[in-house]
């Protein structure tokens, strides 16, 4: 168990940051009228009363602070991950406040994925379920961009289901 303490600590930091920010962001969302009202924008919403729309900020803050503590900010890959993640969080926030077209969201997601790639984040290898690894070579860049955009949309699809996105993302 002792060898896992650093991992437990960093997970606890991320959870604590998100946990501490959530009440403030909920209060702010309610005070500013930044609420997701059932049936107004999406039929995927399952809650029966309005809920604040600022939860993504708490999730990202927990992630970013934990990553900065754990890995530091010296690595371009870490910085790229945080910048790209911030852009996606910002996209979600803007879309929550002023809905955007699918085309605009896609272009924003593509830009965030390109930022990751420019910072050196790239899928280079795939694990072969039959054993060994598969080197992707030049296919790594388009696969990385596709994967980032796909995962952003997967989380977006489950967002609004009362904490499901937060749980899956954590």
Where in the sequence are the language-model features?
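"…together with the soluble PPM/PP2C metallo-phosphatase catalytic core" -> "…together
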Residues: 2-170
